[in-house]
Amino acid sequence: MFPTIRSCARGTSTPADNYMLARRRTLQVVVSSLLTEAGFDSAEKAAVESLTEMLQSYLSEIGRSAKSYCEHTARTQPTLPDIVVTLIEMGFNVDSLPAYAKRSQRMVITAPPVTNNPVVPKALSAGDNKPHPAHIPSHFPEFPDPHTYIKTPTYREPVCDYQVLREKAASQRRDVERALTRFMAKTGETQSLFKDDTSTFPLIAARPLSIPYLNALLPSELELQQVDETDSSEQDDQTDTENLSLHLQGDEVGMEKENASVLQQNSMKGGEETLIDNPYLRPVKKPKLRRKK
């Protein structure tokens, strides 16, 4: 129960060592009071240490024997009968204990001053410290503050302010427009404000394509490759088709001339009326009714 205190360097003591050192000093106070009752005015330090060691060994033996008797009867905590049996086995007269406790010249050892725990400011405290479980002795140091070992997840609250949302949407729209204009400036035709440096302040060319659907009508590269891989017989057929196309073009030219002459005649006949190619936009003409004879 009272293990021997080992000497430790200053500044390297643990809470357990401090606790055992306090118990050792308590035994020294008890030995000093017993020497005072016996009539001694002073004692050497070595003598006090020897008597303290003897008292510590005696009390340790009492505790060890009481513990063994307790475990022998299938119990975990020693009781008063266990201590009485231990004292009897060690040759101590148990009947003299009441008279010794009631002696008149005994010295009363005052309790040590109670040191209050330092008050931690509320600004530095985070939560309440948990008490020790049943299996941890009370003289052990307290648990640290909960914020040192408890994990608290953090998250941002969603922004619900209308003004902030509008500003965020406007900034996103502006960023998208800038990215799109930069992409168009790098991939398409651009115009520059400065003749010397064309890369500074590029402007997207505002000239639309003359025939926007021309790309859709042109053959793709795959079709051109297939045409190149055709046989020589297909080339002959192509020449025939070219000749036919020339004849057709000649016929088309003749037809265009005839249409032009017809249009001129119609324009001469009806100056106010204009020829409209779209049949849905032409003026309505009433059919002529034939009279019955």
From Swiss-Prot:
Keywords: Cytoplasm, Developmental protein, Differentiation, Nucleus, Transcription, Transcription regulation. Disulfide bonds: none annotated. Residues 283-293 have a biased composition (Basic residues). Residues 247-293 are annotated as: Disordered. The keyword Lipid metabolism does not apply. The keyword Lyase does not apply. It is found in: Nucleus; Cytoplasm. A motif (Nuclear localization signal) lies at residues 280-293. Component of the TFIID basal transcription factor complex, composed of TATA-box-binding protein tbp, and a number of TBP-associated factors (TAFs). Belongs to the TAF8 family. This is Transcription initiation factor TFIID subunit 8. The gene is taf8.
